[in-house]
């Protein structure tokens, strides 16, 4: 049910469908619909000059709810219908990226329209229930690892972009960037991609070429946004210069590529795969924070808070 309330009635756990009025902070007019999870975001929204807020009481708390205002979010709705809807969105997006990869492998260009549609589905799934989305995308069979990984990274980048308060257009491009960050792997032999044990030095050199391959594939489309190409080419760069393909460091790496690096590694180590056990979110984030020089430390700390707020408390 949609309901119009004043900004002073806002509480954490409400699902915001729209912000009405002439805003001093224009980012709220460009944001996706979102679940209000964080005190700072709520404070900024109350100071934005909004005349009223449209909330969806079916997806979050109602005004005057007896729920404690200190709660970060409502408990995830784990009913079969919700799980089925999120699973369908993930599979649909995975199918879309699989078709895109096949087209790229055959020499075709990437359709931005198709990727935008897939990103919209991912965004809806993430915003409706991030915990279920993260849970569904952790499960990856051998045949679909690359595709579901792409969907998962896309969703994590959307989730984190919204947490950071980025505008809607930027968050949309983050989602597309996540979907396409590994497209260069279509040029890598499947025997290397699907190898369960460690890669030898020669195989590692080959797989390290995939960012450059991806940049070239994406550049076939003259309308491809620079951010998408940047993320594809630089998501394996590291803050200390120890990454690849160019050994960029610090300020040479864009915010968007830094976000992608965090989301890419987080999904990789927390995923359920046939040949390894997944790490818990806490173990993954602890390990990542200890990797001195790999990630943007301040950004990673914010990502940890974002994930903590998105997953149910044990």
Where are these regions (language model features)?
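Membrane-cytosol interface segments
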Residues: 1-110
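Helix-turn-helix-type domain boundary/helix-start signal
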Residues: 34-35, 164, 197, 222, ...
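Divalent-cation-assisted or electrostatically stabilized phosphate/pyrophosphate-binding catalytic cores
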Residues: 45, 195-217, 238-314
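Signal for well-folded cores of large energy- and translation-related assemblies
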Residues: 46, 127-131, 158, 184, ...
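Acidic/His-rich, divalent-metal-binding segments that scaffold phosphate/diphosphate chemistry
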Residues: 73-208, 215-222, 226-227
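Short acidic/histidine-centered micro-motifs embedded in hydrophobic/aromatic stretches
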Residues: 118, 139, 174-177, 210, ...
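A glycine-rich, aromatic-flanked flexible loop/lid motif
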Residues: 179-186, 227-236, 255-260, 275-277
């Amino acid at each position: 049910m949609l309901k119009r309330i004043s900004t002073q009635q806002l509480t954490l756990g409400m699902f915001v469908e729209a912000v009405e009025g002439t805003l001093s902070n224009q980012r709220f007019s460009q944001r996706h619909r979102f679940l209000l999870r964080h005190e700072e975001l709520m404070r900024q929204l109350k100071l934005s000059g909004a005349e009223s807020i449209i909330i969806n009481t079916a997806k979050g708390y109602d005004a005057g709810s007896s729920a404690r205002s200190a709660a970060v979010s409502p408990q995830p709705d784990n009913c079969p219908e919700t799980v089925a809807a999120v699973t369908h969105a993930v599979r649909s997006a995975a199918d879309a990226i699989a078709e895109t990869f096949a087209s790229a492998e055959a020499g075709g260009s990437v359709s931005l329209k198709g990727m935008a549609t897939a990103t919209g589905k991912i965004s809806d799934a993430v915003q409706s229930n991030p915990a279920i989305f993260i849970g569904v995308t952790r499960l990856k069979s051998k045949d679909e690892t690359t595709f579901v990984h792409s969907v998962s990274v896309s969703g994590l980048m959307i989730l984190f972009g919204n947490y950071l308060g980025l505008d809607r257009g930027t968050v949309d491009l983050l989602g597309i960037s996540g979907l396409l960050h590994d497209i260069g792997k279509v040029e890598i032999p499947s025997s290397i991609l699907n190898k369960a044990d460690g890669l030898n030095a020669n195989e590692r050199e080959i797989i390290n070429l995939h960012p450059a391959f991806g940049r070239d594939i994406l550049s076939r489309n003259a309308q491809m946004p620079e951010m998408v190409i940047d993320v594809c080419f630089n998501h394996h760069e590291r803050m200390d210069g120890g990454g690849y393909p160019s050994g960029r460091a610090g300020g040479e790496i864009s915010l968007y590529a830094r976000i992608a690096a965090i989301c890419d590694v987080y999904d990789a180590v927390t995923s359920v795969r046939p040949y390894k056990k997944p790490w818990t979110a806490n173990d993954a984030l602890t390990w990542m924070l200890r990797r001195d020089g790999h990630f943007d430390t301040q950004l990673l700390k914010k990502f940890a808070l974002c994930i903590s707020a998105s997953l149910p408390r044990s």
